[in-house]
Amino acid sequence: MADARKAALDTALKKIEKNFGKGAIMRMGDAAQTTISTISSGSLALDDALGVGGYPRGRIVEIYGPESSGKTTVALHAVAEVQKQGGTAAYIDAENALDPVYAEHLGVNIDDLLLSQPDTGEQGLEIADALVSSGAVDILVVDSVAALVPRAEIEGEMGDAHVGLQARLMSQALRKLSGTLNKTKTIALFINQIREKVGVMFGNPETTPGGRALKFYATIRLEVRRAEQIKEGTNIIGNRVRIKVVKNKVAPPFKRAEVDIMYGQGISQTGEIVDMAAEKDIVKKSGSWYSYGDDRIGQGRENAKKYLDEHPDVMTEIRQKVRDAYGMDATGEETSETDDQAKEAKDKGTAKNGSKGQSKSTKATPAETALDLGDQPTEK
């Protein structure tokens, strides 16, 4: 009886592979991927809070919070990290608010950044789908979900009711995107705003626009909020920002990270290194003084940060000790089979797009409307 069941199962598996291709179904133990492949967020503290050393490839991440809390800054740091590793990044700027000068200060190579400023929500999501399907994009940022306005709303009159239109649009788009993202190992970062529910007496009245689909499809959801201002004398030079991992499917959720976002500079690497090194006693804190080895590096946190900024060799040494202490060098490694699968998906996407380009007319595709930021004149 057991042999008959096994034979029937083997027949079914062969039939599935014949109809849908090799790899359509397999036993989990046969998969060679044992670790989650990640891209660093650009912040050591956030990488630690995420639990796997960064954003997982092939997944959807939502970053939401109040206005001017640092959501775009967090996303741009991820873009910079992808580009440092030789990857390709795309940015769907639905808010038409991306500052290329600020992005460049954060380490983004604006000449290679693919930028699209769509007219409607449908156009923006079609462009996103075309870019992800190509298999040649490593990270895609959509800024923001709230600004993806449906075509019917744009073409309609002010005051017209369009109940649930954006939610249906997002639900349909995410159904298509989620599978493609997993195959091409592309990270999709969706930036979102917050709204308040009317008439809520108990519980949190805050919610995010775009319906519930993004909440379900997102592997990671990050809540970004300003905690306090950073001052130098009477001048405000930045904000202390708290990032809470509200949802995490690849590691324990509800961890928090605190980072300094300095105006014009982005996330302060030295600030988080001081905090994390002090937590692991790599840098000793006695009263208000910070010391490393036999040397005092500053009285107060800001002076310790200045010392590390002025001594990059010391900062590099401490950073490596912090990474070792938090076990970050051991996470996010890819197996060779995973590399091959991602490469195969990219090659298939490129070949598919190439053949389409030869057979079709010169009509522009949605992906062709996404331009290199370097192709546009930038005022500095």
Swiss-Prot record:
GO terms for molecular function: ATP binding; ATP hydrolysis activity; ATP-dependent DNA damage sensor activity; damaged DNA binding; single-stranded DNA binding. InterPro entries: AAA+_ATPase, DNA_recomb/repair_RecA, DNA_recomb/repair_RecA_CS, P-loop_NTPase, RecA-like_C, RecA-like_N, RecA_ATP-bd, RecA_C_sf. PROSITE patterns: RECA_1, RECA_2, RECA_3. It is found in: Cytoplasm. ATP binds at G65, P66, E67, S68, S69, G70, K71, T72. Residues 329-380 are annotated as: Disordered. Can catalyze the hydrolysis of ATP in the presence of single-stranded DNA, the ATP-dependent uptake of single-stranded DNA by duplex DNA, and the ATP-dependent hybridization of homologous single-stranded DNAs. It interacts with LexA causing its activation and leading to its autocatalytic cleavage. PANTHER family: MITOCHONDRIAL DNA REPAIR PROTEIN RECA HOMOLOG-RELATED, RECA. Belongs to the RecA family. This is Protein RecA. It comes from Lactiplantibacillus plantarum (strain ATCC BAA-793 / NCIMB 8826 / WCFS1). The gene is recA.
